[in-house]
Structure formats: C-alpha cells, structure tokens
Amino acid sequence: MRILYLLFSLLFLALQVSPGLSSPKRDMLFCKRGTCHFGRCPSHLIKVGSCFGFRSCCKWPWDA
C-alpha cells in the first residue's frame, strides 16, 4: 500500500509539470492581445511573434 501512495504522488507531480497541462495565461504573457496557436497561424491570421515553445502569436490583420 505504501508503494501505491508513492506512485500516485509521482503521477500527480508529473501531471503538474507537463507542458501540455500548463496554464494558458503564461503563454499570453508573451503574446500581447493575440492568441497562441501551435505551429503556424491559421490562414485568416498573421504571425506577429512567438509564444512559449513551438506556438505562434497570431493576430487579426487589422489589429497588428
């Protein structure tokens, strides 16, 4: 039973540290008044910078 508690605590720690489950507010610090998209921006938006990792900061053309 002690091992079970240890495994659950390690799983909980791993889920908190993983970048896929992080808060999107941190990404928005790098992208002012835009949206973060993984990879390239959609066709109707233009790239104005980068967010955290491989994400692109995208805005509408009239907001850039």
Curated annotation (Swiss-Prot):
Q: Does the entry annotate any disulfide bonds, and if so which pairs? A: C31-C57, C36-C51, C41-C58
Q: Where is the signal peptide?
A: 1-28
Q: What is this protein called?
A: Antimicrobial peptide THP2
Against Pfam families, the record matches this protein to: Defensin_beta
**Sequence similarity:** Belongs to the beta-defensin family.
Chief site of localization: secreted
**Where do the TM regions start and end?**
none
Q: Tell me the compartments it is located in.
A: Secreted
Tissue-wise expression: Expressed in circulating heterophil granulocytes and bone marrow (at protein level).
What GO biological process terms are annotated to this protein in UniProt? defense response to bacterium
Entry keyword set: Antibiotic, Antimicrobial, Defensin, Disulfide bond, Secreted, Signal
